[in-house]
Amino acid sequence: MALSYEVKEFSTFGKCVCIENGAMELYVTVDRGPRIIKLNLVGKQNMMFNDDALAIYHDEPNLQDMFGKGARWNICGGHRFWVSPEKHPETYYPDNAPVAYTVEHNVFTFYAPKQIFTGWQETLIITVDETEAKASVKHVLTNMSDRTQTGAIWGLNVTDKGGRAFVKQANEDTGLLANRTLMLWPYNVMTDKRFYMDDTYVGLAQDVHAELPFKIGSNNTAGVAVCLNHGTAFRITTSYLPGASYPDNGCSVEMYSCANFLEVETLSPLYTLKPGEACEHIENWELFEEDSADIKDLHKYFL
């Protein structure tokens, strides 16, 4: 099957650009967002969490003060483009306007409208492989405000219930100096059974019965994160820039788990952008059939 796409309604998210290549399905919202709301091997379940009821949102008074009366940010699910460090309400921009897009063969470009107040303009450029379950997701962040701003591109993959995510610990020989970062958030309970750590990997699982969230971050020098769910391995690779300043005390990857979903997040270095300047960050995606639940089988995804 050759690569093809059509625009159609999907769930409660409105119109989506629905891309298929015989191996993989990838849907992107264009009535809002954008969000990469569906990602799966053909015949397998969606790897992305979908909040079909639009029940998870922020509409606090300070958010409405900044973005307008009635403003509401919905998580929706799927992959989204944010800017780190996280701030409330600035980060929770209510991206509910239609998204312009272009298609050039296997390259799909989505232009979110310029954000009011922050002045950020976000563009997603998705290149889908012609025949294999692979895609490149380029994030371009442009400072369209009238002031210099500092931020990092933050790609958040909101994956479905039941998943487990892993990253490899940094193993560079730095002699007498520390070689890895492991950042913890205030709400973490360190005896939480969702959290996994051995000499090689750090992992986090999703549990629908969890009462508290759990979040960890690390300096992912290997540039690889893997999420296992629904008989599928979702591998995300990025470039790590040694010596660069990363958000959250040096994190280039973060994982967040709650009762609804599991997030696998990648971050670019922090960039200081003058008006009109832009930076970019690329995630490369691959999907594999994977039925093993044995951590010993993870190594093949980190070679």
Q: What does each model-found stretch correspond to?
A:
Residues 1-136, 140-303:
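Surface-exposed acidic/polar loop and edge beta-strand patches at domain peripheries
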